[in-house]
Protein backbone atom coordinates (compact mmCIF):
# COMPACT_ATOMS: atom_id res chain seq x y z
CA UNK A 1 0.00 0.00 0.00
CA UNK A 2 1.52 3.37 -1.00
CA UNK A 3 2.53 5.69 1.79
CA UNK A 4 0.95 9.07 2.42
CA UNK A 5 4.11 10.81 1.16
CA UNK A 6 4.11 8.73 -2.05
CA UNK A 7 0.45 9.49 -2.72
CA UNK A 8 1.04 13.21 -2.12
CA UNK A 9 3.99 13.15 -4.53
CA UNK A 10 1.93 11.49 -7.28
CA UNK A 11 -0.83 14.04 -6.82
CA UNK A 12 1.65 16.89 -7.08
CA UNK A 13 3.19 15.39 -10.24
CA UNK A 14 -0.21 15.03 -11.91
CA UNK A 15 -1.06 18.62 -11.02
CA UNK A 16 2.26 19.79 -12.47
CA UNK A 17 1.71 17.86 -15.72
CA UNK A 18 -1.84 19.22 -16.01
CA UNK A 19 -0.62 22.77 -15.43
CA UNK A 20 2.16 22.35 -18.03
CA UNK A 21 -0.33 21.07 -20.61
CA UNK A 22 -2.68 23.96 -19.86
CA UNK A 23 0.11 26.54 -20.22
CA UNK A 24 1.21 24.78 -23.44
CA UNK A 25 -2.27 25.14 -24.90
CA UNK A 26 -2.32 28.82 -23.91
CA UNK A 27 1.03 29.40 -25.61
CA UNK A 28 -0.28 27.65 -28.77
CA UNK A 29 -3.26 30.01 -28.74
CA UNK A 30 -0.99 33.04 -28.47
CA UNK A 31 1.17 31.85 -31.36
CA UNK A 32 -1.90 31.22 -33.49
CA UNK A 33 -3.22 34.68 -32.68
CA UNK A 34 -0.43 36.40 -34.57
CA UNK A 35 -2.33 36.44 -37.84
CA UNK A 36 -3.55 32.99 -38.87
CA UNK A 37 -6.26 32.77 -41.55
CA UNK A 38 -8.69 30.05 -42.58
CA UNK A 39 -9.02 29.73 -46.36
CA UNK A 40 -12.25 28.97 -48.20
CA UNK A 41 -13.14 28.48 -51.85
CA UNK A 42 -13.89 32.09 -52.75
CA UNK A 43 -12.91 34.11 -49.71
CA UNK A 44 -10.82 33.84 -46.59
CA UNK A 45 -12.23 34.11 -43.12
CA UNK A 46 -9.85 35.98 -40.89
CA UNK A 47 -9.82 34.79 -37.30
CA UNK A 48 -6.91 36.94 -36.18
CA UNK A 49 -8.90 39.50 -34.18
CA UNK A 50 -11.26 37.23 -32.19
CA UNK A 51 -8.55 34.62 -31.64
CA UNK A 52 -6.15 37.20 -30.31
CA UNK A 53 -8.82 38.53 -28.00
CA UNK A 54 -9.46 35.03 -26.67
CA UNK A 55 -5.75 34.26 -26.36
CA UNK A 56 -5.17 37.51 -24.50
CA UNK A 57 -7.86 36.57 -22.00
CA UNK A 58 -6.13 33.20 -21.42
CA UNK A 59 -2.82 34.72 -20.34
CA UNK A 60 -1.69 33.32 -17.01
CA UNK A 61 -0.93 35.66 -14.14
CA UNK A 62 2.71 34.60 -14.43
CA UNK A 63 2.89 35.75 -18.04
CA UNK A 64 1.13 39.00 -17.12
CA UNK A 65 3.68 39.69 -14.37
CA UNK A 66 6.55 38.88 -16.71
CA UNK A 67 5.10 41.22 -19.35
CA UNK A 68 4.68 44.05 -16.86
CA UNK A 69 8.23 43.57 -15.58
CA UNK A 70 9.57 43.65 -19.14
CA UNK A 71 7.58 46.80 -19.95
CA UNK A 72 9.06 48.58 -16.94
CA UNK A 73 12.57 48.27 -18.39
CA UNK A 74 13.87 51.20 -20.44
CA UNK A 75 14.49 49.86 -23.98
CA UNK A 76 17.67 50.62 -25.88
CA UNK A 77 16.39 52.65 -28.82
CA UNK A 78 18.58 53.00 -31.91
CA UNK A 79 19.16 56.52 -33.18
CA UNK A 80 20.97 57.83 -36.24
CA UNK A 81 23.45 60.66 -35.78
CA UNK A 82 22.35 64.17 -36.71
CA UNK A 83 25.48 65.24 -38.61
CA UNK A 84 26.01 68.86 -39.68
CA UNK A 85 28.94 70.31 -41.63
CA UNK A 86 31.25 71.95 -39.09
CA UNK A 87 34.32 74.19 -39.08
CA UNK A 88 36.67 73.14 -36.27
CA UNK A 89 38.99 75.55 -34.50
CA UNK A 90 42.44 74.11 -33.97
CA UNK A 91 43.60 70.58 -34.83
CA UNK A 92 40.95 67.84 -34.76
CA UNK A 93 41.01 64.11 -35.39
CA UNK A 94 38.18 61.96 -36.73
CA UNK A 95 36.58 59.95 -33.92
CA UNK A 96 35.80 57.10 -36.33
CA UNK A 97 39.03 56.51 -38.28
CA UNK A 98 41.37 58.45 -35.92
CA UNK A 99 42.97 60.33 -38.85
CA UNK A 100 43.62 64.07 -38.91
CA UNK A 101 40.88 66.34 -40.26
CA UNK A 102 42.63 68.56 -42.82
CA UNK A 103 41.58 72.01 -44.00
CA UNK A 104 40.78 75.44 -42.65
CA UNK A 105 36.98 75.39 -43.00
CA UNK A 106 34.33 72.65 -43.14
CA UNK A 107 36.89 69.98 -42.24
CA UNK A 108 34.19 67.46 -41.30
CA UNK A 109 30.81 66.95 -39.71
CA UNK A 110 29.62 67.06 -36.11
CA UNK A 111 26.56 65.37 -34.58
CA UNK A 112 24.27 68.09 -33.25
CA UNK A 113 22.88 65.69 -30.63
CA UNK A 114 25.91 63.91 -29.16
CA UNK A 115 28.87 65.98 -30.43
CA UNK A 116 30.62 63.19 -32.39
CA UNK A 117 33.25 64.62 -34.81
CA UNK A 118 34.06 62.65 -37.98
CA UNK A 119 35.07 63.06 -41.61
CA UNK A 120 32.18 63.55 -44.01
CA UNK A 121 33.11 60.26 -45.72
CA UNK A 122 33.30 58.44 -42.38
CA UNK A 123 29.83 59.66 -41.36
CA UNK A 124 28.29 57.18 -43.82
CA UNK A 125 29.89 54.26 -41.95
CA UNK A 126 29.16 55.32 -38.36
CA UNK A 127 26.63 52.94 -36.72
CA UNK A 128 23.26 54.16 -35.41
CA UNK A 129 24.53 54.51 -31.85
CA UNK A 130 23.94 58.19 -31.15
CA UNK A 131 23.68 58.90 -27.42
CA UNK A 132 22.39 62.47 -27.17
CA UNK A 133 23.94 64.72 -24.56
CA UNK A 134 21.66 67.08 -22.62
CA UNK A 135 24.09 69.93 -23.21
CA UNK A 136 23.34 69.58 -26.94
CA UNK A 137 19.61 68.84 -26.51
CA UNK A 138 18.45 72.12 -25.00
CA UNK A 139 14.70 71.88 -25.64
CA UNK A 140 11.85 69.47 -24.93
CA UNK A 141 9.27 70.82 -27.36
CA UNK A 142 10.20 70.73 -31.07
CA UNK A 143 12.87 68.12 -30.29
CA UNK A 144 12.99 64.80 -32.14
CA UNK A 145 11.14 62.23 -29.99
CA UNK A 146 13.82 59.51 -30.09
CA UNK A 147 16.54 62.09 -29.40
CA UNK A 148 14.67 63.32 -26.32
CA UNK A 149 14.04 59.90 -24.75
CA UNK A 150 17.65 58.80 -25.33
CA UNK A 151 19.05 62.04 -23.92
CA UNK A 152 16.95 61.75 -20.75
CA UNK A 153 17.09 57.93 -20.54
CA UNK A 154 13.32 57.54 -20.40
CA UNK A 155 10.90 55.17 -22.08
CA UNK A 156 8.66 57.99 -23.31
CA UNK A 157 8.91 61.78 -23.40
CA UNK A 158 8.40 63.12 -19.87
CA UNK A 159 5.86 65.62 -21.24
CA UNK A 160 3.59 62.74 -22.24
CA UNK A 161 3.98 60.88 -18.94
CA UNK A 162 3.52 63.92 -16.71
CA UNK A 163 0.58 65.44 -18.60
CA UNK A 164 -1.30 62.14 -18.79
CA UNK A 165 -0.78 61.47 -15.07
CA UNK A 166 -2.12 64.93 -14.25
CA UNK A 167 -5.11 64.56 -16.59
CA UNK A 168 -6.06 61.15 -15.22
CA UNK A 169 -5.68 62.37 -11.64
CA UNK A 170 -8.17 65.24 -11.95
CA UNK A 171 -9.61 65.61 -15.43
CA UNK A 172 -11.25 62.43 -16.74
CA UNK A 173 -14.74 63.71 -15.92
CA UNK A 174 -14.16 67.16 -17.41
CA UNK A 175 -16.72 67.87 -20.13
CA UNK A 176 -15.18 68.20 -23.58
CA UNK A 177 -11.78 66.89 -22.45
CA UNK A 178 -9.21 67.52 -25.24
CA UNK A 179 -11.92 69.18 -27.38
CA UNK A 180 -12.15 72.35 -25.27
CA UNK A 181 -9.14 74.65 -25.70
CA UNK A 182 -7.22 76.14 -22.81
CA UNK A 183 -5.90 79.70 -22.58
CA UNK A 184 -3.09 79.87 -25.16
CA UNK A 185 -0.76 82.06 -23.06
CA UNK A 186 -0.88 79.58 -20.16
CA UNK A 187 -0.30 76.66 -22.53
CA UNK A 188 2.80 78.50 -23.73
CA UNK A 189 3.85 78.87 -20.07
CA UNK A 190 3.66 75.09 -19.63
CA UNK A 191 5.75 74.62 -22.76
CA UNK A 192 8.43 76.99 -21.47
CA UNK A 193 8.37 75.27 -18.06
CA UNK A 194 9.14 71.90 -19.67
CA UNK A 195 11.86 73.42 -21.87
CA UNK A 196 13.42 75.12 -18.85
CA UNK A 197 12.91 72.62 -16.02
CA UNK A 198 12.29 69.27 -17.73
CA UNK A 199 10.77 66.70 -15.37
CA UNK A 200 10.85 69.26 -12.53
CA UNK A 201 8.22 71.40 -14.27
CA UNK A 202 5.24 72.12 -12.00
CA UNK A 203 1.94 71.41 -13.77
CA UNK A 204 -0.07 70.70 -10.64
CA UNK A 205 -3.53 72.07 -9.88
CA UNK A 206 -1.90 74.78 -7.75
CA UNK A 207 -0.22 76.19 -10.86
CA UNK A 208 -2.83 75.41 -13.53
CA UNK A 209 -6.31 74.83 -12.18
CA UNK A 210 -7.88 74.47 -15.65
CA UNK A 211 -7.19 70.94 -16.91
CA UNK A 212 -7.65 72.17 -20.49
CA UNK A 213 -4.30 73.93 -20.18
CA UNK A 214 -2.60 70.58 -19.55
CA UNK A 215 -4.45 68.87 -22.41
CA UNK A 216 -3.52 71.81 -24.65
CA UNK A 217 0.15 71.47 -23.67
CA UNK A 218 0.10 67.76 -24.51
CA UNK A 219 -1.50 68.36 -27.92
CA UNK A 220 0.99 71.15 -28.61
CA UNK A 221 3.88 68.79 -27.86
CA UNK A 222 2.69 66.36 -30.53
CA UNK A 223 2.03 69.16 -33.04
CA UNK A 224 5.53 70.56 -32.53
CA UNK A 225 7.35 67.27 -33.19
CA UNK A 226 9.66 67.68 -36.23
CA UNK A 227 8.77 64.08 -37.17
CA UNK A 228 5.12 63.32 -36.29
CA UNK A 229 4.30 60.57 -33.79
CA UNK A 230 2.93 58.57 -36.75
CA UNK A 231 5.94 59.14 -38.97
CA UNK A 232 5.99 60.21 -42.60
CA UNK A 233 7.37 56.80 -43.63
CA UNK A 234 4.51 54.92 -41.93
CA UNK A 235 1.80 57.42 -42.92
CA UNK A 236 0.73 55.78 -46.25
CA UNK A 237 0.24 52.38 -44.59
CA UNK A 238 -1.95 53.86 -41.84
CA UNK A 239 -4.08 55.71 -44.40
CA UNK A 240 -4.35 52.49 -46.44
CA UNK A 241 -5.71 50.66 -43.38
CA UNK A 242 -8.40 53.30 -42.88
CA UNK A 243 -9.65 52.80 -46.45
CA UNK A 244 -10.17 49.03 -46.07
CA UNK A 245 -13.79 48.01 -45.56
CA UNK A 246 -13.32 44.51 -44.11
CA UNK A 247 -12.83 44.93 -40.31
CA UNK A 248 -10.43 42.01 -39.85
CA UNK A 249 -8.27 42.91 -42.84
CA UNK A 250 -8.32 46.51 -41.65
CA UNK A 251 -6.91 45.52 -38.25
CA UNK A 252 -4.24 43.34 -39.84
CA UNK A 253 -3.09 46.22 -42.05
CA UNK A 254 -3.09 48.56 -39.06
CA UNK A 255 -1.00 46.02 -37.15
CA UNK A 256 1.51 45.95 -40.02
CA UNK A 257 1.59 49.76 -40.09
CA UNK A 258 2.54 49.88 -36.40
CA UNK A 259 5.62 47.78 -37.16
CA UNK A 260 6.90 50.58 -39.41
CA UNK A 261 7.12 53.05 -36.52
CA UNK A 262 10.42 53.63 -34.69
CA UNK A 263 10.35 51.88 -31.27
CA UNK A 264 10.16 55.13 -29.27
CA UNK A 265 7.27 56.38 -31.42
CA UNK A 266 5.41 53.07 -31.14
CA UNK A 267 5.78 52.96 -27.34
CA UNK A 268 4.58 56.55 -26.98
CA UNK A 269 1.61 55.86 -29.27
CA UNK A 270 0.72 52.74 -27.25
CA UNK A 271 0.79 54.72 -23.99
CA UNK A 272 -1.31 57.54 -25.46
CA UNK A 273 -3.93 55.18 -26.92
CA UNK A 274 -4.26 53.34 -23.60
CA UNK A 275 -4.89 56.72 -21.95
CA UNK A 276 -7.46 57.77 -24.55
CA UNK A 277 -9.21 54.43 -24.12
CA UNK A 278 -9.55 55.25 -20.40
CA UNK A 279 -10.93 58.67 -21.36
CA UNK A 280 -13.70 56.98 -23.36
CA UNK A 281 -14.69 54.95 -20.28
CA UNK A 282 -15.88 58.26 -18.77
CA UNK A 283 -17.88 59.23 -21.86
CA UNK A 284 -21.06 59.90 -19.87
CA UNK A 285 -19.28 62.65 -17.96
CA UNK A 286 -16.78 64.06 -20.47
CA UNK A 287 -18.85 63.42 -23.65
CA UNK A 288 -15.72 62.21 -25.47
CA UNK A 289 -15.94 58.91 -27.33
CA UNK A 290 -13.38 57.35 -29.68
CA UNK A 291 -14.84 59.16 -32.69
CA UNK A 292 -14.61 62.58 -31.03
CA UNK A 293 -11.05 61.91 -29.86
CA UNK A 294 -10.17 60.80 -33.39
CA UNK A 295 -11.34 64.16 -34.72
CA UNK A 296 -9.09 65.94 -32.20
CA UNK A 297 -5.99 63.76 -32.44
CA UNK A 298 -6.04 62.69 -36.11
CA UNK A 299 -4.37 65.82 -37.53
CA UNK A 300 -2.31 66.18 -34.32
CA UNK A 301 -0.58 62.80 -34.55
CA UNK A 302 -0.44 62.48 -38.35
CA UNK A 303 0.78 64.86 -41.04
CA UNK A 304 0.72 64.05 -44.71
CA UNK A 305 4.15 63.92 -46.38
CA UNK A 306 2.48 65.26 -49.54
CA UNK A 307 2.90 68.95 -50.27
CA UNK A 308 -0.39 69.02 -52.18
CA UNK A 309 -2.86 70.86 -49.93
CA UNK A 310 -5.92 69.20 -51.49
CA UNK A 311 -4.50 65.69 -51.00
CA UNK A 312 -3.71 66.48 -47.38
CA UNK A 313 -7.23 67.85 -46.89
CA UNK A 314 -8.78 64.67 -48.29
CA UNK A 315 -6.77 62.59 -45.82
CA UNK A 316 -8.25 64.27 -42.73
CA UNK A 317 -11.22 61.89 -42.52
CA UNK A 318 -8.87 58.91 -42.75
CA UNK A 319 -6.59 60.38 -40.09
CA UNK A 320 -9.60 60.62 -37.79
CA UNK A 321 -10.55 57.03 -38.51
CA UNK A 322 -7.01 55.75 -37.86
CA UNK A 323 -6.95 57.23 -34.36
CA UNK A 324 -10.49 56.02 -33.69
CA UNK A 325 -9.48 52.47 -34.65
CA UNK A 326 -6.32 52.63 -32.53
CA UNK A 327 -8.34 53.68 -29.48
CA UNK A 328 -11.08 51.09 -29.91
CA UNK A 329 -8.62 48.24 -30.54
CA UNK A 330 -5.82 49.37 -28.24
CA UNK A 331 -5.81 46.10 -26.27
CA UNK A 332 -5.50 44.05 -29.48
CA UNK A 333 -3.02 46.09 -31.51
CA UNK A 334 -0.38 46.84 -28.87
From Swiss-Prot:
GO biological process, one term: motor neuron axon guidance
Chain intervals annotated as zinc finger (Phorbol-ester/DAG-type): 80-130
Residues recorded with modification Phosphothreonine: 67, 215
Rho-GAP domain sequence ranges: 143-334
Residue stretches of biased makeup (Polar residues): 1-10
InterPro entries the record matches: C1-like_sf (IPR046349), DAG/PE-bd (IPR020454), PE/DAG-bd (IPR002219), Rho-type_GAP (IPR051854), Rho_GTPase_activation_prot (IPR008936), RhoGAP_chimaerin (IPR037860), RhoGAP_dom (IPR000198)
Keywords per UniProt: GTPase activation, Metal-binding, Neurogenesis, Phosphoprotein, Zinc, Zinc-finger
Region annotated Disordered, chain positions: 1-22
PROSITE patterns per UniProt: RHOGAP, ZF_DAG_PE_1, ZF_DAG_PE_2
Role description: GTPase-activating protein for p21-rac and a phorbol ester receptor. Involved in the assembly of neuronal locomotor circuits as a direct effector of EPHA4 in axon guidance.
Assembly, per entry: Interacts with EPHA4; effector of EPHA4 in axon guidance linking EPHA4 activation to RAC1 regulation.
Protein name: N-chimaerin
Encoding gene (name): CHN1
Amino acid sequence: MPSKESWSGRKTNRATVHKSKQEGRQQDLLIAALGMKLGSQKSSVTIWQPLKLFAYSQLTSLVRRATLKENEQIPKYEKVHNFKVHTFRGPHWCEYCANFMWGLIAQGVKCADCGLNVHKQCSKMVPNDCKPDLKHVKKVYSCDLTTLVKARTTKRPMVVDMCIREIEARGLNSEGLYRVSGFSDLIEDVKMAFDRDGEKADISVNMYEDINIITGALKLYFRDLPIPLITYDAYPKFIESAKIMDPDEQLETLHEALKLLPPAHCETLRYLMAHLKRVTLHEKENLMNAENLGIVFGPTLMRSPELDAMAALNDIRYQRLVVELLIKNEDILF
